[in-house]
Regions:
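Peripheral, non-transmembrane regulatory/ligand-interaction domains of membrane transport proteins
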Residues: 1-103, 107-110, 114-121
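Hydrophobic alpha-helical transmembrane segments and their immediately adjacent juxtamembrane loops
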Residues: 113-182
Length: 182
C-alpha cells in the first residue's frame, strides 16, 4: 500500500505538526511510516504461521516444508531490509548533525525502539518456524512409522509362508515326505 499517502495529505492540507516543525520532524515521520508498514507485514506473516501450524496438525501426513521454507526466506529478506534502517536511525541520533534538533532525537529514539521490536518479532517468528519444522518432521516420522508397522505385519505373515512354499516347491527326490501315503 501507499504508506506515505497520509503524510502527503497532511503536507498538502497543512494538518498536524508536519508543516509547523522542521525537516528533521519530517524525516522522523517518514521513517516512522516505513517502520509501521513492517508491522502490517508481520501481521500477515503471523497469520500465515498460524495457518501453517493448523495445517500441520490437520494434515499430519502432508509435508509442509516448502511453505515453511518460503515464509522463512521472506522473513530473512524482511530482516535484511530493516537492518540498515536501524543503523541510519542510530547515526541520526548519535552524530552531531546540525539539522537534527534534540527534540527530534527523542522521536527517533522511539522509532529505533520500534525497529528493534520489528527485528525481535522477526527473530521470534523464525524460531517459531524452526518449531514448526520440528513438528512437521515429527508428524512425518509418525506417519512413516505407522506405514512401517503395516509392512512389518505383512512381512511377518508372508515370510513363513514363503519359506514353506520354497521348501515344498523344490524339485528333489530324497525329501522325506515326498513318498509317504498320507
Amino acid at each position: 500500500g501507499d504508506y506515505f499517502g497520509i503524510i502527503r495529505d497532511r503536507l498538502r492540507n497543512a494538518k498536524g505538526k508536519i508543516r509547523k516543525k522542521c525537516a528533521d520532524y519530517l524525516i522522523y515521520v517518514l521513517i516512522d511510516a516505513i517502520v509501521d508498514s513492517y508491522y502490517d507485514i508481520l501481521d500477515h506473516y503471523a497469520n500465515e504461521l498460524e495457518a501453517i501450524e493448523n495445517d500441520i496438525f490437520i494434515q499430519k501426513n502432508k509435508n509442509h516444508l516448502s511453505r515453511i521454507h518460503h515464509v522463512n526466506k521472506d522473513l530473512i529478506y524482511l530482516r535484511r531490509s530493516i537492518a540498515p534502517l536501524n543503523e541510519v536511525i542510530f547515526r541520526l541520533m548519535k552524530e552531531e548533525i546540525v539539522l537534527i534538533q534534540p527534540e527530534s532525537k527523542i522521536f527517533l529514539r522511539d522509532v529505533l525502539d520500534h525497529v528493534n521490536q520489528v527485528v525481535n518479532q522477526i527473530d521470534v517468528d523464525r524460531e517459531y518456524l524452526s518449531d514448526l519444522v520440528q513438528t512437521n518432521m515429527a508428524n512425518m516420522n509418525s506417519h512413516l512409522n505407522s506405514i512401517i508397522k503395516v509392512l512389518t505385519l505383512i512381512s511377518t505373515i508372508f515370510i513363513p509362508l514363503t519359506f514353506i512354499v520354497g521348501v515344498y516347491g523344490m524339485n528333489f527326490d530324497n525329501f522325506p515326505e515326498i513318498h509317504s501315503q498320507n
